[in-house]
């Protein structure tokens, strides 16, 4: 037998032996949190976002939560408590038609509007809107609110969830809108649209173009020249409302001005519920059953009296 052959055989046997999970393994197995199993919550990031210094009492740490669906943008100011997360204020992109923006409710420009609306609404609720007006006109440059003499600026931390934080992501559009609205949020300009990784500087003109929907207008012009049929189908809602690439910036400026003027949430007028026809018998109360029985007895007695008169 060759030297070392037995050791080689034993090594190969060890390699191919399947690891058996014992009864103790399954008995002591602990499942992860439900939202971690579903892939909805990054608890490692959440722990760092909500943990407060132990020498601060009854001082919640607020988070700017930005989430995106296929047709909506959700932005909320939230703080954690033992009983669950508490929402201080919220803004949605489906509210933007009230301010003059009826199309493109999920792009970067709409995300900026939602962040701006949330910031102004939160500060108005806390009666800080006059003291912290924020950046009234968006220029694309980085903006950080300066503390006033009386009250410190409202501070929140950006909660992006599980989204991939690439440069120019819409979640940073919400961040930029909230910053211009007057909320103090620790941030860097490296992820704003228009940041050049080669020069390591933010180009304000490119960022401004995204805030005012310039990237959408450029795509509209490209389709109008190259693929008119696709333009008719892709931008049908824009065409229906007579929105052209040249008047895109003016439209967004009006939306920003309307948000600054009145950021309060508007209650939707809902029609009263219709009264449906009832097919089953209504359940009577005790008093109604008693009155019905008395009426039947009176009817029977009157019928008997009528028969006796005939006889």
In which residue ranges do the predicted regions lie?
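Ribosome-associated RNA-binding proteins
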Residues: 2-7, 11-311
């Amino acid at each position: 037998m060759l030297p070392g052959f037995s050791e080689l055989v034993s090594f190969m046997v060890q390699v191919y032996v399947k690891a058996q999970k014992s009864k103790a393994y399954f008995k002591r197995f602990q499942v992860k949190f439900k939202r971690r199993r579903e892939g909805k919550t990054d608890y490692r990031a959440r722990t760092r976002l909500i943990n407060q210094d132990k020498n601060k009492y009854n001082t919640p740490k607020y988070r700017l939560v930005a989430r995106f669906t296929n047709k909506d943008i959700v932005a909320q100011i939230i703080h954690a408590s033992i009983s669950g997360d508490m929402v201080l204020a919220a803004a949605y992109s489906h509210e933007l038609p009230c301010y003059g923006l009826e199309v493109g409710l999920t792009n970067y420009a709409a995300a900026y509007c939602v962040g701006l609306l949330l910031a102004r609404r939160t500060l108005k609720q806390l009666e800080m809107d006059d003291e912290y007006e924020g950046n009234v006109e968006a220029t694309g440059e980085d903006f950080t609110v300066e503390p006033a003499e009386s009250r410190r600026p409202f501070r929140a931390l950006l909660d992006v969830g599980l989204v991939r934080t690439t440069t120019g992501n819409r979640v940073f559009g919400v961040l930029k809108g909230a910053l211009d609205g007057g909320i103090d949020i620790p941030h860097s300009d490296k992820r704003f649209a228009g940041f050049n990784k080669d020069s390591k500087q933010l180009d304000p003109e490119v960022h401004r173009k995204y805030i005012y929907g310039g990237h959408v207008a450029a795509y509209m012009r490209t389709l109008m020249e190259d693929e008119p049929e696709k333009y008719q189908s892709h931008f049908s809602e824009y065409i229906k409302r007579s929105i052209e690439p040249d008047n895109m910036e003016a439209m967004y400026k009006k939306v920003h001005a309307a948000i600054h003027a009145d950021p309060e949430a508007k209650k939707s007028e809902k029609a009263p519920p219709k009264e449906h026809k009832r097919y089953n018998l209504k359940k009577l109360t005790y008093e109604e059953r008693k009155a019905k029985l008395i009426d039947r007895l009176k009817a029977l007695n009157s019928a008997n009296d009528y028969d006796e008169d005939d006889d």
